[in-house]
Amino acid sequence: AMAVEPNDDGTQIRHWAAQGIIGIRLSAASRAQHSDPLAQWRTAAELDLVVSAPATPSILLGDEFAEVLRTFPNLSIVIEHLAGVDNSAVPPYEDYARTLAFAEHPNLSIKLPGFGEFCALPHPFSDVPPLAEMAIEAFGPSRVMWGSDWPPVSSREGYDHSLSFPMEHLSSLSDDERAWIFGETALEVWRF
């Protein structure tokens, strides 16, 4: 996905879409430094691009993201990093659970990172909070996709473990559910 400059009014997005990109990366609260603050979101919607959106629970629960959801109900948005929840989250994970209510929007999917983002290091993780399971329950496997978070994952559990640990941890899911999470969802959302 293309990183978008804050002052882009959609011109650069259009340029790169003509070259074949299929997605852009915007913070869930992103606003263009332009007369139309939603210009980047609007351009993505007009061009049928996917928006990969890094966020935190507080950003997702804010007015800016609510406006995006209201204004662009058909825009495909991937919420990155399990909505930005990290290893400081504690049960009952109220803010995180509130972000998972966005699963009611069929245009949203969520990215499952390496577990080092939300488990206490080092790997192997001894205590795994149920955050992945909560996301899968809310969104369903066909709207959850694994992503390594490379290169930052290299300084946490390492790339190999970022895939092998979630696959092992979620081994109780059916083969079909795991196929969606570890491949099919990304293929469908990113149109490969």
Predicted features along the sequence, with ranges:
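Short, acidic/polar
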Residues: E5-W16, D36-P37, E94-D95
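Divalent metal-coordination and catalytic microenvironments
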Residues: I24, A44, H81, I110, ...
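Catalytic pocket-lining loop regions of alpha/beta-barrel enzymes
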Residues: R31-M145
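Short, well-structured secondary-structure segments
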Residues: A1-P6, I22-R25
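Short beta-strand segments
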Residues: A1-V4, K111-G114, M145-G147, F182
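Short glycine-enriched loops at secondary-structure junctions
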Residues: V4-D8, A29-S30, W150-V153
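Mid-to-C-terminal alpha-helical segments outside catalytic/metal-binding sites
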Residues: M134, A138-M145, S154-F192
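Glycine-rich phosphate-binding "P-loop"
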Residues: W16-R31
